[in-house]
Amino acid sequence: MNNMDTRLLFQHLDKQLVTVKDDTLMAFTKVLQDRFGASLRSIIFYGSCLRSRKYEDAMLDFYAIVDNYQRAYDSKRQALLNSCLAPNVYFQTVEVDGVKVQAKYAVLSTKDLLLQTSARAYHSYFWARFAQPFALAYHADEQARAQAIQAQVNSVATIYSKTIGLFDSLPSAQEFWVGALQKTYSAELRAESKLRAGSIYSSNQSHYDAVFSKLLKAGVMVPSHVSRWTVWNWVVRAAWGKVLSILRLLKAVSTFENGVDYLAWKIERHSGVHVEINDRHRKYPFLYCWPMLWRLWRKGAVQ
C-alpha cells in the first residue's frame, strides 16, 4: 500500500463527493452545530438512507467529525470514552413538516478519522464503512472536505490491501467488493443477512467498478495465490472484532437513548427475526440482554 499512487483515486472521489442539503439534513446539521459548536468539522451522511433518500420509518446515519474530543464535549467522561474506544454513538430526533425523523450519529475526531482508515488500523470497523459511498451534510471549510476524501481514499486502499490476499488471482470488481465486504461483516456482531454485501455493491455498481479500476491503476499488488497470512489475520480480526462489538454495545448503553430498543429494531429490520424487549432489558441491559443475544445468535439473527 505504501507504494500506491492514489492521486487518481483522490481526484475521482473528489469529483464524486457531494454535499447533500434538504430540510431534514439541515435540521440535523443545526442540532449538531448547536451541540459541538466550532469543534464540528464535517457531517458525513452514509448508509441505507443515503442510498434510498427515504427518511420515514428509518434511521439516518451520520458521522460528526470534530477537531478533538476535549473541545467537542462539555463532559470529560464522554470525551474520555470517545478517546478510549471510538466512536461514541448518540440518538437524535428532529421534526420536519410535522414528521418526526430519527437518526444516530457517531462522533469521531479528525485525527481518528485519518488514523483508523489507514493501513495502521488493524480492525475493519472504520475502513469498511468509509470505503463505501458517503455524502457530506456539512463541512466547515475545504480542508474538512479534503480530509473526508482522504479518509475514503485511505479506506479503499486499506480494504484492498487487507483482503486481496484472500483471492488466488485478480478478482473482478464485483468479486472483490462482495468478498471484501462480507469479510468485514464477519469481523463484527452484525444483523445483516449474507446477501447484504451483494446488495450494497448492486445499489451503486458504477461507483464500485470505477473505484476498483482506479485502484488497479494505482499500482496495487495482484495476487497469484491465497495468502495464509491474510487468512490467519482475518481469523484474528474476526475474534477481536466480536470483542470490540460487545464493548461498543456496552458503551452505547450510556450514550444512546433507548439503545436496547434500537438494537432490537435493527436486528429485526435486517434479519426478519422478531426481538421481544421488556422493561427488564431496558432497565438492566448488562444483566438481561446476554441470554437474548445468545438466542438471537443461535437463530442466525446476529452473526
Which residues does each PLM region occupy?
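Catalytic core of pol beta-like nucleotidyltransferases
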Residues: M1-R35, I44, L50-E56, N68-Q303
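Short glycine-/polar-rich loops that comprise or flank the Walker A/P-loop
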Residues: A58-L60
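Short hydrophobic/aromatic beta-strand micro-patches
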Residues: Y63-I65
